[in-house]
Amino acid sequence: MKAYKKEFINFMIECGVLTFGDFVTKSGRKTPFFVNTGNYQTGSQLRRLGEFYAEAIKENFADDYDVLFGPAYKGIPLSVTTSIALSSSFDIDVRYCSNRKEVKDHGDTGILLGSKLNDGDKVLIVEDVTTAGTSIYETMPILKSQADVNVKGLIISVDRMERGQGEQSALTEIREKFGFKTCAIVTMAEVIEYLYNKEINGTILITDEVKGRIDEYYKQYGAK
């Protein structure tokens, strides 16, 4: 496992983003782990988060993109901090934009924030966590309505590796439906591999008991 992936897992734990216990997802699934990206709340945390996204983007997409698109609302700060990190860490100066949930009828009108989209632009979508892929199905018509863009891919922070609308994971469904690359900074398989029986700040987060519950969860909800 790449060093930045291990650092990112530690970072999520430090920020209280990745936790283990008893939770219920929006879809009603009882889950033994939870990824709450709303817990990235400070400037230094957002800076580091952008650096992790930039590292994963460099590995998976090199510099084959013109624009980072962050779907509203959580994707907005992600596209901003990631574009800054790409510039500062890799000298890649990329544009960013996001959509408005509500179209303005005064001042800077239109549905987009940040850069405008042009025909032929290579767009990389930056998201937080995709469980069912709903935001991507909403994003694609928005992008295509603005210009004849070429969507190069989607990157998220954590692939939960759960079934989406069918038997496959949401990322696999999106990749097959739209024909572009999908990837994550880390997968839950990598998280489990790294944390299983490993002491972090004096605590073992994934004990044998927790690992057993995670295994049972994936038997029921894991992607094929």
Swiss-Prot record:
Gene that this sequence comes from: pyrE
Name of the protein in question: Orotate phosphoribosyltransferase
The EC code for this enzyme is 2.4.2.10
Q: What class of enzyme is it?
A: transferase
Q: Domain of life here?
A: Bacteria
A single Gene Ontology biological process assigned to it is: 'de novo' UMP biosynthetic process
Q: Which NCBIfam families match?
A: pyrE (TIGR00336)
Pathway field? Pyrimidine metabolism; UMP biosynthesis via de novo pathway; UMP from orotate: step 1/2
- Swiss-Prot/TrEMBL cofactor(s): Mg(2+)
On subunit structure and binding partners, the annotation says:
Homodimer.
The keyword Magnesium belongs to this UniProt entry's keyword annotation: yes
Q: Which UniProt keywords apply?
A: Glycosyltransferase, Magnesium, Pyrimidine biosynthesis, Transferase
Give a yes or no for keyword Isomerase in this entry. Answer: no
Please tell me where orotate binds in this chain.
131, 160
Role noted for this protein: Catalyzes the transfer of a ribosyl phosphate group from 5-phosphoribose 1-diphosphate to orotate, leading to the formation of orotidine monophosphate (OMP).
